[in-house]
């Protein structure tokens, strides 16, 4: 079955930088498979714009910072969502694709679906970890889910939601064997000697909560492992400026701050101390021993704890189905505990070999040529709609 030769229109929404990255990957795959005249529009970031995407609103208007911290953004987000729904119903695109940002996109997807516009969602929410009741909203809103992780389709199938496992684009991007020596050369680090990458997050609130603890842990580690060097990526000049007072307060640290290049910094390391998030999956794909940590405001933490199901939060542990790397969260994330755990990860060669095996198996499972698989799934949805037309 062939798609129509008249102009196709695909509406898309990405709500934060990670979604922009995924959506740009999907756009590249779609542009290889759909007519050149296809129009892509909605809400997106710089990576999507590089593919010719027409963004009607700034993506950063949708980027929120947790339950309590997001309250001030709600009125504008609701206004944008209302305008987007009206636009979709007026223009009736061939499909709507929501990329992550479920709290924003599910409502739009339900409106599209109710109007007969196919709704596709890219990135299954972590219903297997917390807020499992969202599966009911997914079943009402989503015609087809594109899943990053292999265990998700079975969960969705039980709720009657069609889905496709497409793998994770990071697994396609990152080589199976990281070039640690080359990364050290690129960053001007010594070829020999222990290196620990420290990643306290990329948001002001994250740095404020966990930054001082991470720096105190680094000071303890340097006392106990005098030859150790640290590398810390700063995603933006603003973040580097935010880190500077902490750097100034610890002049004894053998610390290299890099401008971005977080993947290079992690590749150069022997072990990693990292705030929980997608970056922990990146660290696993780089086959690095790590310690996962986070601190969030008390009320946000209470909400998360009451709605969670799994005993772990780090993606490497979730994918393995067990603790393969330590997690130190909230009040357990003390400088002493973080230093002890990170140095253990650095020094334990048997554990390093075991983790390399576990993470290699994980890498191979997630390496699926995500852009192609996701684009092919979208094309199938468009073809099915064409067949019903």
Curated annotation (Swiss-Prot):
- Whether Disulfide bond counts among this entry's keywords is no
Catalysed reaction(s)? Answer: a lipid X + a UDP-2-N,3-O-bis[(3R)-3-hydroxyacyl]-alpha-D-glucosamine = a lipid A disaccharide + UDP + H(+)
Residue runs in coiled coils: none
This protein's pathway: Bacterial outer membrane biogenesis; LPS lipid A biosynthesis
One term under GO cellular component: membrane
Provide the E.C. number(s) assigned to this enzyme.
Answer: 2.4.1.182
PANTHER family in the cross-refs: LIPID-A-DISACCHARIDE SYNTHASE, LIPID-A-DISACCHARIDE SYNTHASE, MITOCHONDRIAL-RELATED
Q: What is this protein called?
A: Lipid-A-disaccharide synthase
The gene designation is lpxB
């Amino acid at each position: 079955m062939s798609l129509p030769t008249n102009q196709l229109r695909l509406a898309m929404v990405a709500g934060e930088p990670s979604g922009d990255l995924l959506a740009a990957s999907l756009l590249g795959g779609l542009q290889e498979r759909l007519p050149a005249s296809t129009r892509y529009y909605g809400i997106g970031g710089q990576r999507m714009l590089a593919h010719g995407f027409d963004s009607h609103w700034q993506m950063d208007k949708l980027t929120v910072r947790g339950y309590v911290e997001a309250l001030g953004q709600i009125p504008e987000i609701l206004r944008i969502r209302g305008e987007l729904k009206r636009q979709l119903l007026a223009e009736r695109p061939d499909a709507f694709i929501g990329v992550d940002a479920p709290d924003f996109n599910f409502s739009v997807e339900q409106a599209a679906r109710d109007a007969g516009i196919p709704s596709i969602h890219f990135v299954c929410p972590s219903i297997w970890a917390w807020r499992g009741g969202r599966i009911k909203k997914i079943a009402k809103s989503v015609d087809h889910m594109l899943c990053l992780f292999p265990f998700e389709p079975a969960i969705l199938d039980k709720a009657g939601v069609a889905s496709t496992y497409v793998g994770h684009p990071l697994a396609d991007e990152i080589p199976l064997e990281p070039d640690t020596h080359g990364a050290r050369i690129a960053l001007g680090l010594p070829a020999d000697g222990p290196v620990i990458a420290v990643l306290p997050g990329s948001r002001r609130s994250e740095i404020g909560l966990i930054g001082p603890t991470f720096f105190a842990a680094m000071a303890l580690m340097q006392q106990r492992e005098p030859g150790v060097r640290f590398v810390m990526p700063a995603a933006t000049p603003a973040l580097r400026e935010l880190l500077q007072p902490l750097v100034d307060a610890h002049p004894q640290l053998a610390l290299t701050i890099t401008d971005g290049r977080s993947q290079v910094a992690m590749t150069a390391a022997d072990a990693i101390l990292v705030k929980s998030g997608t970056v922990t999956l990146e660290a696993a794909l780089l086959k690095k021993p790590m310690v996962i940590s986070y601190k969030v405001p008390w009320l946000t933490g209470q909400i998360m704890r009451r709605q969670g199901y799994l005993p772990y939060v780090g993606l490497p542990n979730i994918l393995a189905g067990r603790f393969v790397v330590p997690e130190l969260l909230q009040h357990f994330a003390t400088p002493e505990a973080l230093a002890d755990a990170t140095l253990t990860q650095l020094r334990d060669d048997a554990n390093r070999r075991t983790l390399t095996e576990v993470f290699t198996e994980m890498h191979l499972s997630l390496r699926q040529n995500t852009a192609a698989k996701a684009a092919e799934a979208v094309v199938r949805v468009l073809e099915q709609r064409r067949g019903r037309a």
